């Protein structure tokens, strides 16, 4: 069997996991600690991929949580959890799900832990983030991109 017919060996490895950016703000403290704890929570999530070199990618997961009491911001947490991943030998159609779903799924527990620690150290009740289905989010993004790419048809 010639080497030309062999597929490249698939390789996936975590090179480094790190906090790229973090912020915790309590703009209305200490007054906010006197209010009844009935929070309104806003949660935003995003991810970004950057190819560093052939087969080496940085994936970053951004989490922003704003908690309000009576329209006053109790706290705002922002974290960008990132990782550097070696990914090579995979077919092109598998790279999107790896970078858009699998890698963020690896990063999320670290971001969740950082959020929990920051909120606890800020003197607030625990903020426990539920697991996220990154496969479903990725598929939703793919479908939205496909819909936007299609020209509008008259009805």
UniProtKB/Swiss-Prot annotation:
Entry's localization field: Cytoplasm
GO molecular function, one term: unfolded protein binding
InterPro entries named in the record: SecB, SecB-like_sf
Regions crossing the membrane: none
Subunit organization: Homotetramer, a dimer of dimers. One homotetramer interacts with 1 SecA dimer.
Similarity-based family: Belongs to the SecB family.
NCBIfam families according to UniProt: PRK05751.1-4 (NF004393), PRK05751.1-5 (NF004394), secB (TIGR00809)
Protein name, as recorded: Protein-export protein SecB
Name of encoding gene: secB
């Amino acid at each position: 069997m010639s080497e030309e017919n062999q597929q490249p060996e698939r390789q996936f490895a975590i090179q480094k996991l790190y906090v790229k950016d973090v912020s915790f703000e309590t703009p209305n403290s200490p007054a906010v600690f006197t209010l009844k704890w009935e929070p309104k929570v806003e949660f935003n999530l995003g991810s970004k991929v950057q190819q560093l070199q052939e087969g080496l990618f940085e994936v970053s997961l951004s989490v922003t949580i704003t908690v309000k009491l009576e329209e006053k911001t109790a706290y705002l947490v922002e974290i960008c959890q990132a990782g550097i991943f070696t990914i090579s030998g995979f077919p092109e159609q598998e790279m999107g799900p790896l970078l858009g779903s699998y890698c963020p799924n690896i990063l999320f527990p670290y971001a969740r832990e950082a959020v929990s620690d920051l909120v606890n150290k800020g003197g607030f009740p625990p903020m426990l983030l539920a697991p996220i289905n990154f496969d479903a989010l990725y598929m939703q993004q793919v479908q939205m991109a496909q819909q936007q790419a299609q020209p509008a048809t008259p009805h």
